[in-house]
Amino acid sequence: EESENNDNFEIIELTEDTETSEQFDTPKGAVSNGYYVINVTKSEISSTSAYAAIQSALDEAQENATTDLPYKVFVDPGKYSLTQGLRIYSNTYLCLTGVTLTRNKGSNYNMIKVGDSNDTHSGYYYQNITIDGGIWNENGNSNTAIKICHTQNITLMNATLKNCSNSHLMEIAGNNGITIQNCNFADQALSTSAKPYTYEAKIG
């Protein structure tokens, strides 16, 4: 894991699980606990792909979520292949309780990134983002699983990041107010030919 130029960085250990009843009791389009709710179902994922179904919900949140009415995206529990990297934007809560996402073997993309790949935004452009839950399985690939840059008020909680090779499980830089809560980082492999910085952990 790597962190550079982050203000108010906090790592917290908790033991209580996140409540999941809201996911199953709240229909799509309802407002619950201050969030507009979107449910990504197994049938949607089966008819397209995990990437297409989840990213469609995140794109809807990008277009419509506000600080006054943020969006919460629930993904049905299950094990899914992630064929492309997800993008998440401001005022969005992504709930992945009971979800395992596995990157395609030999692929080259971040599993999830704040903002777009060609972003030129600076400062704390993206705000109020939560990634809650999920097993993020890098499947032995060598690209960072989660990348978080130029954000304010972001939380990563109840997640497991694992199984990357010669790379970071997570990179964070240029942020203000990050909470990492009840997360596990595991199975990061380093080959003898890899450069040392691919295995470092820096917080500063």
Question: What function would you assign to each model-found segment?
Answer:
Residues 1-4:
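Sec-dependent signal peptide cleavage junction
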Residues 9-56:
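Right-handed parallel beta-helix/beta-solenoid
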Residues 12-15, 41, 76, 83, ...:
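A structural detector for beta-sheet-dominated domains
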Residues 45-51, 67-109, 136, 141, ...:
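N-terminal extracellular ligand-recognition/capping segment immediately after the signal peptide
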Residues 54-66, 81-91, 104, 119-124, ...:
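Short, T/G/N/S-enriched strand-turn elements that build extracellular solenoid repeat scaffolds
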Residues 68, 101-103, 109-138, 146:
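N-terminal adaptor/linker regions at the entrance to substrate-recognition repeat cores
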Residues 82-85, 103-109, 136-145, 164-172, ...:
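Short glycine/acidic-rich loop motifs that flank beta-strands on beta-rich extracellular proteins
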Residues 93, 97-100, 124-138, 152-163, ...:
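Right-handed parallel beta-helix
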